[in-house]
Amino acid sequence: MRKTAVRAVALAAVCFLSVFGTCSYAKEATSEPIQIVVLGDSIAKGYCGANKPELYCYGQTVAEEIAQRAGKSYMYQNYANNGLATREFNEKVLKGQEVQDSLSGADVILITMGSNDLLNEFKKTAQEILNTDTKFKSADEALKEVTEHVKSNPLLVFRIIDALGNWDYQEFETQWIEAMDTISSCKKEEAQIVVTNIYNPVKQMELPGTMNQVVEDIIGNMNRILEKRSSEYGYQIADLANSQVTEHVQKDGLHPDQAGQDLIAEIVRAQITGYERNMPKSQVDGTAVKVEEIPEEKQSQIRPEKWGICLILAAVMLGGVRFLQKNRKENRHK
């Protein structure tokens, strides 16, 4: 009888530890982090000028918000690079194994591309029209040089407008298709992709003559390419072109300031679905934490539905111990 009781207690103890161990990490096992990957240029990176800390970019804000609303943790990876145009995007970023591995596990992919294609074309055109060997580092630098030359030769404006108007959109579309082919081949079928379209990066600059309208037309054509390919590749367009982002830019007149980044985050977030709980945001019991920042020490988080089993096993163990104690007392009196 005594051996049977001991075995019962031992068995109950093993079961208790097994269930308790499962309960302790149930939340972690059943709640995979949301994986967000950001690709693109300096806008997606959160550029804030040379030798200055980067802004809190829109991708980070979106990651935190959807994780919070879903009550999950998140893994956020940003592969954006300053000055990146679509050709370099394909050659220097998307061919990387690390990037492709990240895309294969991503739940949400955010992409901002295209502005540098336009700006690079503007710099190239300015260099050719001005017949200079100077390689402009920025569109702002090129614009200042153009403005200076136009003062003495107003006809230069028409040459620049003509050159920009004849830009080869086919090259941009070809590179964009290649990029989306790569991303589509890497991503999970259910992954969501949001692409920001292009806002006028020189709207706040005082362009000579009617050049600003030409730039607007070019941007419109580029955005139509992005829109045309959206159904084919299954991505959503976050419309920055018709937003107030250009009202929230840095001193360079191009890159968004923090308010601009926050506005982009709001527009992008509206295109992402499936991360809402059936409760108000204020009642969400999850905390958005980067996976790599989760403390190594595990905290016991027993799921409510497991408490009943744990209590029953505890009762069995306690009953077994009392039974043994009673038997010992009876044996002493004999």
Where are these regions (language model features)?
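Structural motif
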Residues: 83-95
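Alpha-helical cap/lid subdomain in secreted, periplasmic
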Residues: 97-254, 258, 262-273
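Serine-esterase "nucleophile elbow" of acetyl-processing enzymes
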Residues: 26-82, 98-102, 262
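Sec-dependent N-terminal signal peptides of Gram-positive bacterial secreted proteins and lipoproteins
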Residues: 2-25, 305-325
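Surface-exposed patches in mature extracellular/periplasmic domains of secreted proteins
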Residues: 71-81, 193, 238-240, 279-280
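Conserved catalytic region of serine esterases and O-acyltransferases that act on ester linkages
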Residues: 30, 196, 222, 228-243, ...
